Amino acid sequence: MLEAKSAALLEDTIDYVFDNQALLLEALTHKSFSNEQNDRTEPDNERLEFLGDAVLGVVVSHYIFRTFPHLPEGELTRIRSEVVSEKGLTVIGKAICLGDYMRLGKGEERSGGRQKSSLLANTMEALLGAVFCDGGFDSVRRVIEALFIPHIQRAARRKTGVDYKTRLQERLQARFGDVPQYVLIHADGPPHQRSYSVEAHFRGSCIGQGQGRSKKSAEQAAAKQALEYLEE
């Protein structure tokens, strides 16, 4: 049985107190522990893990959808995937010392189960599923946002493969109902080493300039500068 002190410490860490302590116990119980019980009455956390995975996806998706209204779908998907991945969940699990509270069988304990990424990630999902069952959607949303927002923000700052042209077009369409135009100003250099200069125009005004080794890269640079101009 999980000690009351241990339960209270974990609840304090996630800032949520369970009405039904059995749900917390179940969330922390690995199947290796359940299998070693003679009466087999200790449920493992796999069902709660299934539920927590779904709830986490919804809450994180909704948060990044609200917080980053100008990011294209591909970037939203990238951020969510990074945050809810096994690696992302393991980072959260280690931050709250979740491994210290897990109930493991003897074999899993000997093999270092408390530090295994897969176990930490699965138990993290089970814990969120337990919060949802105990307190409902608003409760689990608050827990998830408190734990995950810093990691979401970090993932959002990693602008891997950002399509600035798409982002600029979506921003201008949403705000003004119109799209930008890209104007090639000049191209310099020999064919094998050309440099292009492009301006992003909107309703007759230049809102960004960019240079690149191709017209596409120059347009992306111009769109990036235009976005920075709009955010000033």
From Swiss-Prot:
<keyword id="KW-0460">Magnesium</keyword>
<dbReference type="GO" id="GO:0019843">
    <property type="term" value="F:rRNA binding"/>
</dbReference>
<dbReference type="GO" id="GO:0003725">
    <property type="term" value="F:double-stranded RNA binding"/>
</dbReference>
<keyword id="KW-0378">Hydrolase</keyword>
<keyword id="KW-0819">tRNA processing</keyword>
<comment type="similarity">
    <text>Belongs to the ribonuclease III family.</text>
</comment>
<keyword id="KW-0255">Endonuclease</keyword>
<feature type="domain" description="DRBM">
    <location>
        <begin position="163"/>
        <end position="232"/>
    </location>
</feature>
<dbReference type="GO" id="GO:0008033">
    <property type="term" value="P:tRNA processing"/>
</dbReference>
<dbReference type="Pfam" id="PF00035">
    <property type="entry name" value="dsrm"/>
</dbReference>
<dbReference type="Pfam" id="PF14622">
    <property type="entry name" value="Ribonucleas_3_3"/>
</dbReference>
<dbReference type="InterPro" id="IPR014720">
    <property type="entry name" value="dsRBD_dom"/>
</dbReference>
<feature type="active site">
    <location>
        <position position="53"/>
    </location>
</feature>
<feature type="active site">
    <location>
        <position position="125"/>
    </location>
</feature>
<dbReference type="GO" id="GO:0004525">
    <property type="term" value="F:ribonuclease III activity"/>
</dbReference>
<dbReference type="GO" id="GO:0006364">
    <property type="term" value="P:rRNA processing"/>
</dbReference>
<keyword id="KW-0540">Nuclease</keyword>
<feature type="binding site">
    <location>
        <position position="125"/>
    </location>
    <ligand>
        <name>Mg(2+)</name>
    </ligand>
</feature>
<dbReference type="GO" id="GO:0006397">
    <property type="term" value="P:mRNA processing"/>
</dbReference>
<keyword id="KW-0963">Cytoplasm</keyword>
<comment type="function">
    <text>Digests double-stranded RNA. Involved in the processing of primary rRNA transcript to yield the immediate precursors to the large and small rRNAs (23S and 16S). Processes some mRNAs, and tRNAs when they are encoded in the rRNA operon. Processes pre-crRNA and tracrRNA of type II CRISPR loci if present in the organism.</text>
</comment>
<dbReference type="InterPro" id="IPR036389">
    <property type="entry name" value="RNase_III_sf"/>
</dbReference>
<dbReference type="GO" id="GO:0046872">
    <property type="term" value="F:metal ion binding"/>
</dbReference>
<keyword id="KW-0698">rRNA processing</keyword>
<dbReference type="InterPro" id="IPR011907">
    <property type="entry name" value="RNase_III"/>
</dbReference>
<keyword id="KW-0507">mRNA processing</keyword>
<feature type="domain" description="RNase III">
    <location>
        <begin position="7"/>
        <end position="136"/>
    </location>
</feature>
<feature type="binding site">
    <location>
        <position position="49"/>
    </location>
    <ligand>
        <name>Mg(2+)</name>
    </ligand>
</feature>
<keyword id="KW-0479">Metal-binding</keyword>
<keyword id="KW-0694">RNA-binding</keyword>
<dbReference type="GO" id="GO:0005737">
    <property type="term" value="C:cytoplasm"/>
</dbReference>
<comment type="subunit">
    <text>Homodimer.</text>
</comment>
<dbReference type="GO" id="GO:0010468">
    <property type="term" value="P:regulation of gene expression"/>
</dbReference>
<feature type="binding site">
    <location>
        <position position="122"/>
    </location>
    <ligand>
        <name>Mg(2+)</name>
    </ligand>
</feature>
<keyword id="KW-0699">rRNA-binding</keyword>
<protein>
    <recommendedName>
        <fullName>Ribonuclease 3</fullName>
        <ecNumber>3.1.26.3</ecNumber>
    </recommendedName>
</protein>
<dbReference type="InterPro" id="IPR000999">
    <property type="entry name" value="RNase_III_dom"/>
</dbReference>
